Amino acid sequence: MTDLRELFSPTRLPGLSAHGRALLRHLREHPQAPRFRDFSGHRLGLAERWQARARHAWWQRRAAPDWLAGEPLPAWVGPFVARCAHGVDAHAGKAALPFAQLPTMDRHALATQLAAHVPRSLPLDELICFSTSGTTGHPLRVPSHPRVACDYYAHHRRALALFGIVPKAGVGDVGIVLAGFQQRCFTYVSVNPLQRECGLAKINLHPGEWRHPGDRAAYLDAMAPELISGDPVSLAELLRLGLRHRPRALLSTSMALSAGLRAELEAAFACPVLNLYSLNEVGPVAVEVPTLGGFVPLQPRLLIEVVDDAGRSLPPGERGEIVVTGGFNPWLPLLRYRTGDHASIVRTPQGLMLQGLEGRAPVRFRGADGRWHNNIEVTRAMAPFALVRFALHQRADASLVLRVDAHEPLPALAARLRAALAATFGDTPIEIAALRADDKVRQYTSALAGAETAR
């Protein structure tokens, strides 16, 4: 039996209406509902909701910065740097430096000196710290706040608008389902106070979290969410469920989404699939628009650079590490923060765009003829396949191991995968194996000397 005091907690859900209460009970107590393990809520009072609406309206009217290296900085950057220099211990003394000479910061600095990066003047009574995985970098706790969680909504709306979608869910509707697929994850129901208390559910599609195997499809069909968000692992699981419901859009975050899987999802659900480039430290950075050939930046107050190993901004079209300044989280102002991801940045008639986006440090792989190949060549070779995830490793003897997570049987897929890699690497020995890790894995690794260049 649901603990209604917890479900309707005025601390978590201030101002909850009668129709909001009814929707929460429907989400949680439906006969096919999963085992919800937690309680959560927006924690926004009336004044904070109006402030959020004002912020969101301002963002909707502003474009992302149209700035490239060597051009005059946007007007807001100078004051932002000054506030960081005077109010954030980690940035003390930086106000007098030209922007191009500001040192870069990285995930290691946040992992080891997090308190020094939180502004001294901000209240800490409602501070939230989210833990992030360390499988692709240093384990990290990200300081946040209920208003920050609310502001993700505004930037997702900006992304949806690029595909002609304006969310319509309202009273009695389920606006979004956040779908995971893990042995165990945080699951709850809530409402969106900025969209007439439409419903939100964070669910785990792992079969062990449901009473019966068929309940997953039955529950999603009954809730009929306007949007479904997940990562390629959980979205691929949706393909196996036989859903009748068709959301207006799917949002993919957290991991790289292959072009093949996106095409299969779009065909199955007859809706766009948004491939979001998003980080826990920054929030949604950009969204891929395939017709434009790259990722379109989303945040009006996030300056994006592409830099070399020494932290120097690179000219348009040159490939380097993505560095960001600004963001919408006041509790974690970022000043030339190295994301660990790589791309080039160009100006198009539609504005700035990130092209060739790849996560984490580049890795080179050696072919049978001794030539080196960038990992982006591997990404392109794998793009036609509807893979949930893949990871490529080169052993010390130069042989390759490709591990894949796919809903197509591996024996039927292996020959085509091997042929796709052989087109780049020649007759290098290639082993194909299943990828069964429950969490994120590093996509590209090598035991060969010279495969990776340290910063």
Residue ranges of predicted features:
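Conserved S/T- and glycine-rich ATP-binding loop of Class I adenylate-forming
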Residues: 84, 132-135, 175, 228, ...
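Short, hinge-like loop/turn segments at secondary-structure boundaries
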Residues: 195, 245-247, 291-295
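Conserved AMP-binding/adenylate-forming
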Residues: 261-347, 361-363
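AMP-binding/adenylate-forming catalytic core of the ANL superfamily
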Residues: 228, 328-425
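Nucleotide 5′-phosphate-binding alpha/beta core
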Residues: 1-131, 138-169, 227-229, 249, ...
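AMP-binding/adenylate-forming
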Residues: 150, 154, 176-233
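Adenylate-forming
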Residues: 225-262, 275-281
